[in-house]
Amino acid sequence: MNPIDTDDLEKHTPMMRQYLTMKAEHHDMLLFYRMGDFYELFYDDAKRASELLGISLTARGKSGGDPIPMAGIPYHAVEGYLAKLVQIGQSVAICEQIGDPATSKGPVERKVVRIVTPGTLTDEALLQERQDNLLAAVYQGKVGFGYATLDVSSGRFVIAELETKESLEAELQRTNPVEILYSEDFGAMELLHHFKGKRRRPEWEFDYDTSIKLLLAQFGTKDLHGFGITDARLSLQAAGCLMQYVKDTQRTALPHINAITRFNQTDTIVLDAATRRNLELTQNLSGGRDNTLAAVLDNTATAMGSRMLQRWIHQPLRDHAQIFARQTAVNELLETTAHESLHDQLKALGDIERIMARLALRTARPRDFARLRQALNLLPQLQQSLAQLSAPHTVKLGQLLGEFPEEQQLLERAIVDNPPMLIRDGGVIREGYNAELDEWRGLSEGATDYLVQLEAREKERTGIATLKVGYNRVHGYYIEVSRLQSQQVPLNYQRRQTLKNMERYITPELKEYEEKVLSSQGKALALEKQLWDELFDLILPKLHELQAFARAAAELDVLSNFAERAETLGYTCPELSSEIGVKIEAGRHPVVERVSQTPFIANPVTLHNQRRMLIVTGPNMGGKSTYMRQVALITLMAHIGCFVPADRAIIGPIDRIFTRIGASDDLASGRSTFMVEMTETANILHNATAQSLVLMDEIGRGTSTYDGLSLAWSAAEYLAQQVGAMTLFATHYFELTQLPELMAGVYNVHLDAIEHEDTIAFMHAVQEGAASKSYGLQVAALAGVPARVIKAAKHKLHQLESRDHQVEGANVNGTRAPIQTLLALPEPVENPAVSKLKDINPDNLTPKQALDLLYELKRLS
């Protein structure tokens, strides 16, 4: 049966009618339906939950004549199951009992009180501590895309206007959202195929006017001019859909979402999706974090600092003034060793950014308040440390930290030192904070003394030495005696419970005291919850300032971390230049040098206006790819304000970094390895500029030798002569080493190796000039290819080389043609239809002539 079919509700029991009605309202997610101590799932939800969570699938009688599939989880274990579900992109609606079973006629009143989706998480137990948790929305216009992201756990709201699919793909790669909303007519689904949490939304949710009204209401402004986004129409439509979705799922005010910013690609170095993937910035090729740039650079003290660092890595700055401000701050922290004390102080702050989001949503727990109190207690100490520093950026961050003496004192008075996890059972508000609460608690807490006195008195009165007075949650207070002595109890003892060897009684006096104590406990708990709610009202007026404190602390953490990494890993401060070029002395790969079992061989690189392209040759396993990647990573690190693994680095203006390194089949899109390679190459050739850094590795491998050589030659020629980009072009086509002889600005470099008999030693050192050979057979031998195969390969290689010397490049006269002649592209021939079109004057054509001309153009094309 389909559980959202509510046409025949009368066939079902009252409880199942209630369930089916709620399920119809939340048909696109699992419904956790609270029944006593369990959350139950029925019908298809039960089957899916059983499959996803590995829980038992049973049946609950019949309703409407059919057995009801059912699965359940204990309420106290729900967070663990929710974590599993959101990790695989599943959303859950949580339906609680809000009525009293004792007074309910028919099914207990229930209500969906919480919706958990991957992109709207704020609960600490469900979030990845050191990763942003982004909800995204994308809207496709006639030209371009609108893209919006929101981190509900911090309030960070960002939009971007993107002109092409490639730009959207790069943004998806950069932001890596855990949940994506898209419109019904979205036409680029191939870009979303590997994302788990995809949600198709109706077209009307992207309506422009509705979106503007939603955003104005959220920010409390008359217009959006102050945010500088009024012309970002498509992304505002995406932002409106996203905002509505968050309101629907959170079902509460969202005061921490109080601003929206626009991501402009012109402010940062553009990294396309392939580049982010190939450089393994925050995610390795296997999808993990090990052996990535972030893993090496991240020794931050706080989770919010770690998340900010990863955002910086994906958004290298172009503005040298901003970079220099960061560098100056890092340099001062390093020289004064202030980074050491700052690290310890920041570590004690905790994740204030996410705590403030939970406070805004009123879902914060007692320990969140305790952590906030601890952070505010540390502020004076942190301010004192910063007072010794004079770098302008550090001073600015110190001012943003702010001061919160009233909030600190409030939390000190209100919250106990070590509060429980939940407010549910009380014990959170400190004694002395509220006189009425202390009075009610006094009645309850005095029960222990009273019970001791009552037990002694009753033992003496009855003569039963083993008599005990106790309490449990089910039966309340009781007097317990053994079965054998039950004949001796006084007449005013009323039997309350019979056990195997014991009888339990209550007296009118004890009953009266029980009611008094339980009443005081209930009143104390109710008052404590009221005081707890009031704490939110007292703290939230400073929400914006506390959010600024969190952001400033996170940035201080990143800068302090850069200083520590520079000291620990031997990094130097890169120099920024206004002249185009990249000069690195003794550069090292930041990741490889950390994981290598042998000392890393440092290498230089020099690129400038007169030396724009390096043809990189050398043996397989010689280190060409490592060398190229380290140049890109050092350049990127310099543009986030980080020191770099080199003796010296001088970096000029960079607008984009492109990489065409490695490839594999894109099965989901039906593209072969060669097609992927050519697509990435086309993107580079179309978009690279004279200020771009381009890494091209082994272009043309996936096709025939001459096809591949032709493509590699032409791509290198185009980059060198038409684009003028700073390029490292690695190849095994030795014909390309002739390029420096044919065009200015192109130079050969190679990675060296030493051959001795049948063995080879890789030197990993970059030398000027072209390599002499590729050593492919020696590498094959190292890989364990059988000796017979290697021997046969040597024989075949000798045959091929002999034939090539005789045949390759021979023309009709038997002379060898120059390689540039062989590979030169033919002059383009203009299409006859285009020539005809150029001669047409449309203003002089009659309708009949225009129609005849259309047929002629069709024939010519």
UniProtKB/Swiss-Prot annotation:
GO cellular component: cytosol
InterPro entries: DNA_mismatch_repair_MutS, DNA_mismatch_repair_MutS-lik_N, DNA_mismatch_repair_MutS/MSH, DNA_mismatch_repair_MutS_C, DNA_mismatch_repair_MutS_clamp, DNA_mismatch_repair_MutS_core, DNA_mismatch_repair_MutS_N, DNA_mismatch_repair_MutS_sf
Pfam family for this entry, one: MutS_I
CDD domains: ABC_MutS1
Residues engaged in binding ATP: G618, P619, N620, M621, G622, G623, K624, S625
Source domain of life: Bacteria
SUPFAM superfamilies recorded: DNA repair protein MutS, domain I, DNA repair protein MutS, domain II, DNA repair protein MutS, domain III, P-loop containing nucleoside triphosphate hydrolases
Coiled-coil segments: none
Protein keywords: ATP-binding, DNA damage, DNA repair, DNA-binding, Nucleotide-binding
Molecular function per GO: ATP binding; ATP-dependent DNA damage sensor activity; damaged DNA binding; mismatched DNA binding
PANTHER family found in the cross-reference section: DNA MISMATCH REPAIR PROTEIN MSH1, MITOCHONDRIAL, DNA MISMATCH REPAIR PROTEIN MUTS FAMILY MEMBER
Entries under NCBIfam families matching the protein: mutS1 (TIGR01070), PRK05399.1 (NF003810)
Function: This protein is involved in the repair of mismatches in DNA. It is possible that it carries out the mismatch recognition step. This protein has a weak ATPase activity.
Family the entry assigns: Belongs to the DNA mismatch repair MutS family.
Name of this protein: DNA mismatch repair protein MutS
